[in-house]
Amino acid sequence: MTMDADAMETETTDQVSASPLHFARSYQVEALEKAIKQNTIVFLETGSGKTLIAIMLLRSYAYLFRKPSPCFCVFLVPQVVLVTQQAEALKMHTDLKVGMYWGDMGVDFWDSSTWKQEVDKYEVLVMTPAILLDALRHSFLSLSMIKVLIVDECHHAGGKHPYACIMREFYHKELNSGTSNVPRIFGMTASLVKTKGENLDSYWKKIHELETLMNSKVYTCENESVLAGFVPFSTPSFKYYQHIKIPSPKRASLVEKLERLTIKHRLSLGTLDLNSSTVDSVEKRLLRISSTLTYCLDDLGILLAQKAAQSLSASQNDSFLWGELNMFSVALVKKFCSDASQEFLAEIPQGLNWSVANINGNAEAGLLTLKTVCLIETLLGYSSLENIRCIIFVDRVITAIVLESLLAEILPNCNNWKTKYVAGNNSGLQNQTRKKQNEIVEDFRRGLVNIIVATSILEEGLDVQSCNLVIRFDPASNICSFIQSRGRARMQNSDYLMMVESGDLLTQSRLMKYLSGGKRMREESLDHSLVPCPPLPDDSDEPLFRVESTGATVTLSSSVSLIYHYCSRLPSDEYFKPAPRFDVNKDQGSCTLYLPKSCPVKEVKAEANNKVLKQAVCLKACIQLHKVGALSDHLVPDMVVAETVSQKLEKIQYNTEQPCYFPPELVSQFSAQPETTYHFYLIRMKPNSPRNFHLNDVLLGTRVVLEDDIGNTSFRLEDHRGTIAVTLSYVGAFHLTQEEVLFCRRFQITLFRVLLDHSVENLMEALNGLHLRDGVALDYLLVPSTHSHETSLIDWEVIRSVNLTSHEVLEKHENCSTNGASRILHTKDGLFCTCVVQNALVYTPHNGYVYCTKGVLNNLNGNSLLTKRNSGDQTYIEYYEERHGIQLNFVDEPLLNGRHIFTLHSYLHMAKKKKEKEHDREFVELPPELCHVILSPISVDMIYSYTFIPSVMQRIESLLIAYNLKKSIPKVNIPTIKVLEAITTKKCEDQFHLESLETLGDSFLKYAVCQQLFQHCHTHHEGLLSTKKDGMISNVMLCQFGCQQKLQGFIRDECFEPKGWMVPGQSSAAYSLVNDTLPESRNIYVASRRNLKRKSVADVVESLIGAYLSEGGELAALMFMNWVGIKVDFTTTKIQRDSPIQAEKLVNVGYMESLLNYSFEDKSLLVEALTHGSYMMPEIPRCYQRLEFLGDSVLDYLITKHLYDKYPCLSPGLLTDMRSASVNNECYALVAVKANLHKHILYASHHLHKHISRTVSEFEQSSLQSTFGWESDISFPKVLGDVIESLAGAIFVDSGYNKEVVFASIKPLLGCMITPETVKLHPVRELTELCQKWQFELSKAKDFDSFTVEVKAKEMSFAHTAKASDKKMAKKLAYKEVLNLLKNSLDY
C-alpha cells in the first residue's frame, strides 16, 4: 500500500466496525474484517458467498452514505443481467435504498441534474462500469462522493476495460494527488487470472498487476478444505468424442452450393438501388452467414446447418440481424438464407421411415456429427436423474439456437425435459431481450426449464443452487471462463463435463492446467500477501483536456470515441451519415481531421507521434468544439444537452382540471341603495323564414355599459326551420327600485325555470330563495319589451303577472263579465276571468305538464266529445275519469286551448337541428279547473321568444369573456368577435372555431422563432436549431405560456347545453362564483371547473397569434407573443459569413439566378443552398441544412398567409387542409424536378444519385402535372424538396430578410396555387376519417418492403398490399388504393 492509502484507511477504519450477519461463515467474517482494514480483492470459488461479504461491508459503512448524506456507494457488475440479481440481494439483506442502471435506460443522455436526483434518492447504485466511467468523465458524478466501490468479477480490470479506466483515470489520479478522499475498494472474483494457456509460473505477475491496478490485496482461504464444508464442488471429467467429417462428396457438394448461392446473390445486388457502403455491408453479411453455415455443417452436421439457415431466414428482428440494411437488402439476405435452407433440406430424408431420434443412423449419414451425438448420449445417460438442471456452454450464438431446437425434438421422446437457449444480443446473428433471458433463468430456477444451452453470458453471476450438471460443449477459452462455468454447478455431487475431441492433446493439456490453476492462484496470493501494492505508474503525461468549471475530462485515449459520438448526433439522412474523416500523413507526422459541414468546426490539424495521430487531432478537436459551445462544460454534445432539456420540458406537470371564467360585467354585489341603475339593450330576433309564432323583442339590462362591439352587435342563431338574425342595440339607462328589481328577477326565474325543467318542482325553491341580500350574484335582467317608447320599454304588466291571487284578478277584471266579453272560470288557484287564463302559463298537477294557453274554446266543455283521434264517442268527463281518475266538477265551463311548453335547445351549433319531438297534437284542450296559473298574462309568442334567450346570452357571455381577455393584452385592439373565434374550440360545435386562426398563427409562430434562432445561433446546426425551436413552441411550452397568463379560463371548450345555463337572479346558492385575479390584477369569476387538454391551451395560444396577425399585422402578433411570454423580435443582424468562395466554379450561377428571377449579392449563399451534407469538399464551408430550416418556415408562413388572405370566408378546417396539401416535401420535390434543379445539387452519394435518376425517369414517363396535393405515386428523395426550402432561405437572408422578395421568386416555381375546389386530403387521413365517420373497421400491417391496409365495411372487405422503395410511400399507396375501392363500391 502507498502511504496515502494507508493514511486514508487508518482514518476510516477507526470509525467502521464490522457488521456481520448472524449466518455468515467464518471465512466470510474474516474477509469482512480484512476489507474494513484495507482495499481487498476477495478471491473465492463461485458459490462461496462473495456477494454476502460485499453486503456486510456496505452495512458496516452505511452510516457514511445514508440519506440525507450526499455520499453513496457504487456496486459495479460486468453484465446487465447481473444488475437486477445483485440489487435484489442488497434489498434482501439491507435496508439501503438501491438504484439500478444499465444502458437501455437511456442514461447516456442524462445530465448532472438527473444524476443528482438519483444520488439524492438512492444510497447504493448498481450499474455496469461503462455508465460510471462516462459519468465520471463528464463530471456528473464525483469519485470523492463514493464511499465504497464494489467491483464484481474484477478480473476484467485490464487493458481498456471500463474497470481499468475508472481506476487509472480517476482513482489513482486522486490517490497520487495526496487526497485521502477516495472510496474503499472491494473486488470479487473466482479467478484472479484471465489467460488462455500461459505457464503457471506467470500467474503471480498477473495477480500483482491486478492488485496494483485495484490498489488492493487479495484475500483467499488458505486451504480449499475450508470452503469444502460450505461450498459443493463439482466433479470434473472429460467426455471424448471422435471427430469424423461428414462424407466427403456430400460435404463438397453442399459447400459448392453455398458458394454458388453466395455468388448469385452478390451479383443480384447490382439490380438493387443501393449505395456502395450498403453493397459492401450486404456482401459482408452474405459471406459471414455462409461461413457460419459452413461451420455448422462441419461441427454439428447437415441437420443443424439446415436449422441454422432456417432460423436466420425466419428472423423478424431487423435491428440486430440485419443492422442498417434497407428493406430490399434485408429481403435479399433472407432469400439467401432460405435458399441455403432448401439446399440442406434436400439432403435430409423425409417421410415416416426417417426419424430425428435415430441419432446413430443420422450420424452415419452425416446429418449429425459425432460431437453432437456425444452430447445427446451424455444427456440421455442422466435420464434417471429426476430434477435435472443442466447448462450446456457453447461458443457461438447459432450453436445455442440450433442445439436447443434439436434437443427440443429428441429429448421429449425420452423424458419430459424442457430445453431453452440463452445468448448475448450483440453478436449480430440473433437478438434475445433481457426480459426473455431473465424469464428463462427464472424458469430454470423453478424447474420449469431443465436444460439451458448458453453462451458465455451465463458464466458470470447466475445463481442457481439446484444446477447439478454443466457440460462444456465447446472448451473454455481461458481459465477464467473455465472456473466460472464450472462454478455454475452448485448442487452437491454435481458433474462438470468437458467435451474434448479424441487425440486433441493440446486442448486436453490446456484444460488440465485450468484444473490446477485455481490452486496455483491461491498459493501465489498467500505467498505474497505481505507484499505491499506499489503505486501505479503515473501516466499523467498523457495529454488530456479538463474543463475547469465542472472537472469533466477527455483524454487522448477517449477523445476519438467522443468525436465519433459528437458526429453521430449531427443531422443526417438516408444518404449521408455524418462521421469524421482523417487525412493522415505519417511521413510528416501530421493528421488533418475533417468534420461534417453541419459542425461549427470544419477542419483541425495536429502533429504527434504516428501511433497517436488520430487521438491527438481528436483531442484538439474536442478542445475547439468545447470552445465554440458544441461540447458543453460536461463535454456532452450540444444536441444531447438540447434533447435533455427538451425531454425535461415534456415532463412538465399539467393539471387537466381548469377553471371556466364568467364575465364580471354580468356579476355584481348587493347594493343597499333604494334605486339601481340598469343599462338596457334591445334584443331583436328576426327569422329568415315564416314561423308559427312571432318572435318578440326582449330587453337585456346590465349594471354596466357594455363595450360597443358587444352592446351593438349582431349574430345569427340556427334551428331546423332556418336562421334567426339577432341584433343588440343600446336603448338607455333606467333607474329601478328594489321592488321593481325583485319583480323582474321573479319573472325571469319563473319563466326560465319552467322552460328549463318543464315542471314546477324546482320553481318554488328558486323563488323562496329570491331576495336582494346576496353577496356576489348574477345581476342582469331579461325582461319583455312593450314595443312602445311612449311610456316604458319594459312590459311591467307581464312582469307583475307572477303568482297573482284570484282576489286580485277578480278586482281588476270585475267589469269584464258585465260587458259579455268574458266570464269567470274555476281554476286550481280559484276564480279567474277568461281574459286572464286565455294567455297564460299553466301547470296541470294530474300529469305534471306545463302548458301555454292561447284562447278559450267556447264551443267545447266537459260534455263535449274528445277531438282526439281514435277517441270514438268518449266525452272529456269520461276521458279524465277513465284516464286520470278525476271527476270534473265544472263541466259546463269552456275548455282552454293549451300548447305543450317549448323545449330549449342550443341554437348556436353549426349542425342542422333535428325537428324537436312534438306531442300527438300541437294544441290540447284543458279543463280550467285542473290548471294552476303560473304567469298571466303572457302570450305564446313571448314564451317562444324566451326559448332563444339562453343561446343569445351564451353568445353575449362568450363575447364578454373574449373582451375581458382582450383587455388583458395591452397596446393592441382587435375586434372582440375575432378573439372569441380564437378561444372557441371545435368541441363547442359553434358556427366558427379556432382552426383557421390556429393554422395561421402556427405558421407565423414557427416563422418568427426560426428567424430569430437562425440569426442569434449562427453556429448551431439544423438539428440543434430544430430541437431549440421545438423547445420554444411545443404544445407543452405553449400551454405553459398560456397558463402563466391564465388563458385556460377563457377557453370555450364545451358544447353549450341550455340545461346547464345559470339563470340570472336566482339565489347564489344555486351556483358558485369564485373570485379570481388575472395577472394584471383585474378580477374575474370562475363559474365552474372542467377538463381541458394541454393541447387545447396550446392551440388557443397559436390561434390568438393568428387573430392578432390577421387583424393587426405582424407587429400586433409579436406584441401578443411578447405578452404571453414568447420573446421574439424581427431586428435583423448581419451575420459574418465565411470567406467568399468562387461560386461560379461550383454551380451555374447564371442559370439559377435566371430561374429564381433573383440576383444574389452573396453568391456563397446560393452554393450553400445547393450543397448536400454528403458533399465534403473543404472549399464549401456549409451544407444547406440551416438554410432549409429557415426556408421551410418562411415558405410555410408565406403560403399559409397567402391562402388565408385570398380566401377570407373559408370554413374552419379547410385552410388547414389547403396548407397541408400545399406545404409538404412532395410538392416541393415535384417542383424541383420540373425546374431541373436536381442537375444543380452538389452531393457525393451514389444512393442519392440513383434515387434522383429513378425519380426523374418515372416523372418523365408519368402524366403528372399538378404541383400540389397527394396525387404523385413517385417516391421523391427528400433532398429535392429540401433544396426548394433552402433556396427560399438563401434568398430571404440575401435580401435582408424580405419575405416579399422570397414569395415573388419562389411562387412562379410553385405554379398554380391550390384552391378550395382543388384541395385533396392525404389518402391516409381521408380513409381514416371516412372509417371513423361510418364506423368501419380499419386495420393495417407492415413488413420489410410492403404495407397492407384492410377495411371491413357493411359485411364487405377491402384490402390492398403496396410495395415501394420506402415504407412511407408504400403506406400512402395502400391507403390510396383501398380508399378508391371503397368509394367505387359504396358510392361515398
Curated annotation (Swiss-Prot):
Motif (DECH box): 152-155
GO biological process, alphabetically ordered: cellular response to nitrogen starvation; defense response to virus; RNAi-mediated antiviral immunity against RNA virus; siRNA processing; siRNA-mediated gene silencing by inhibition of translation; ta-siRNA processing
Compartments in which it is found: Nucleus; Cytoplasm
SMART domains attached to this UniProt entry: DEXDc, DSRM, HELICc, PAZ, RIBOc
Protein name: Endoribonuclease Dicer homolog 2
Segments forming domain DRBM: 1315-1384
One cellular component term from this protein's GO annotations in UniProt: nucleus
E.C. no: 3.1.26.-
Ligase keyword on record: no
Major site of localization recorded for this protein: nucleus
Domain Helicase ATP-binding: 31-210
Annotated binding of Mg(2+), by residue: 1188, 1282, 1285
Domain Dicer dsRNA-binding fold: start-end pairs: 559-645
Annotated family: Belongs to the helicase family. Dicer subfamily.
Residues engaged in binding ATP: 44-51
Keyword Oxidoreductase in annotation: no
Cited Pfam families: DEAD, Dicer_dimer, Helicase_C, PAZ, Ribonuclease_3
InterPro entries, sorted: DEAD/DEAH_box_helicase_dom, Dicer_dimer_sf, Dicer_dimerisation_dom, dsRBD_dom, Helicase_ATP-bd, Helicase_C-like, P-loop_NTPase, PAZ_dom
Cofactor: Mg(2+); Mn(2+)
MF annotations from Gene Ontology: ATP binding; helicase activity; metal ion binding; ribonuclease III activity; RNA binding
